[in-house]
Amino acid sequence: MVLATTEQIAGYEIIETLGIVLGNTVHSKHLGKDIAAAFKTLAGGEIRSYTELLTEARNIAIQRMIAEAEKLGADAIVGIKFGSSSVMQSAAEVLAYGTAVKIKKI
C-alpha cells in the first residue's frame, strides 16, 4: 500500500478513486503515568509517556485506515491527514483519513 499526504504520487497515475477511508483509536495512559506526567509539567521538557501514547495511537489509526482501503481494493491512499482531540481527561483520539485510490505506474 502506497501512502501519501499529497494528492498525487510521483511516477503513478490515479486510475480510480474508491472513496474516503479512515482509522481512529482512543487511547489513555495508566493513572500512575498520568501523575508522573503532571510532575513533569512542573519541570518542563518532553512528557515521554504522552509522546509514546500518541505515537502508538497514530500507528493504530494508520493501520485501521489501511485495512479499510484494502477492503476496497485500493493500491494507495492519497491526501492523508491526521487529527487528534481530547475525549476525556487523559484520553486522546487520533484519527487518520485519506482517499483510497487505484494507481498504475507511468
UniProtKB/Swiss-Prot annotation:
This protein's superkingdom? Bacteria
InterPro entries xref list: UPF0145_dom_sf, UPF0145_YbjQ-like
A Pfam cross-reference name? YbjQ_1
Regarding protein family, the annotation reads: Belongs to the UPF0145 family.
Q: Which HAMAP family match?
A: UPF0145
> What is the protein name given in its UniProt record?
UPF0145 protein Tlet_1264
